């Protein structure tokens, strides 16, 4: 999908860019049977307390039900449309199966309307097809990857992301993947993945341009701690501009903000990570 640039008719339009939706999308009307209501929570939990900051005030939108499990085995389908999804960075494709059922999937790069797709161990190694990792050859780029067999995809779902199959364990239980971040990790060979790279890779190059576009997406301003009151942030308070007054920068909750590992070392999946993304960059 190409980028569209704007003339500097206003300060907000200067340097602004957006995705040219007319280049790849085939319809602007979603499938009604696959829509559901998406409630606004504005970052609050069931008690009304803010659990996620900087959220609220977005535009109304419907949620598209996406097939992350890809468990419709040995039933071929045809790509009917490629559509915009306001709930994610990637585009989605509407698949019509020969038994009459319709499902949305993430649209990989180079997926075309009218193309046939399938899922299951016997599927061909073609863009859009979903197979167990054990059936996919080394060097293949995949996305929409499960962490537990049958639980639905959790990894590699954002626009432009990918993972590449590097090899297998000696017993064949695990498949070794290289992620776009540089991380190498093992995943059970019985987990499913979809062939190809997630489309809409230019999404990361979009220049928002003005604050209003983020407000439409439900992103509220991020305020510096140093301009808050002392009861709101450890950096707050003082007359005029003041230094932090602490040995190191702190989070709003009083924990060290720089150089502290946040991943739980006792997390069970740590043993499956062969090389972290930070080690790869060294």
UniProtKB/Swiss-Prot annotation:
Ranges annotated as biased composition (Basic residues): 263-282
PROSITE patterns: RIBOSOMAL_L2
InterPro entries (UniProt xref): NA-bd_OB-fold, Rib_uL2_dom2, Ribosomal_uL2, Ribosomal_uL2_bac/org-type, Ribosomal_uL2_C, Ribosomal_uL2_CS, Ribosomal_uL2_dom3, Ribosomal_uL2_RNA-bd_dom
Cited Pfam families: Ribosomal_L2, Ribosomal_L2_C
SUPFAM superfamilies (UniProt xref): Nucleic acid-binding proteins, Translation proteins SH3-like domain
Entry keyword set: Ribonucleoprotein, Ribosomal protein, RNA-binding, rRNA-binding
GO function term, MF aspect, one: structural constituent of ribosome
GO CC entries: large ribosomal subunit
UniProt region (Disordered), positions on chain: 215-282
Keyword Ribonucleoprotein: yes
Family in the record: Belongs to the universal ribosomal protein uL2 family.
Function, as annotated: One of the primary rRNA binding proteins. Required for association of the 30S and 50S subunits to form the 70S ribosome, for tRNA binding and peptide bond formation. It has been suggested to have peptidyltransferase activity; this is somewhat controversial. Makes several contacts with the 16S rRNA in the 70S ribosome.
UniProt-recorded name of the protein: Large ribosomal subunit protein uL2
Annotated source species: Mesomycoplasma hyopneumoniae (strain 7448)
Source taxonomy: Bacteria, Bacillati, Mycoplasmatota, Mycoplasmoidales, Metamycoplasmataceae
Gene this chain is encoded by: rplB
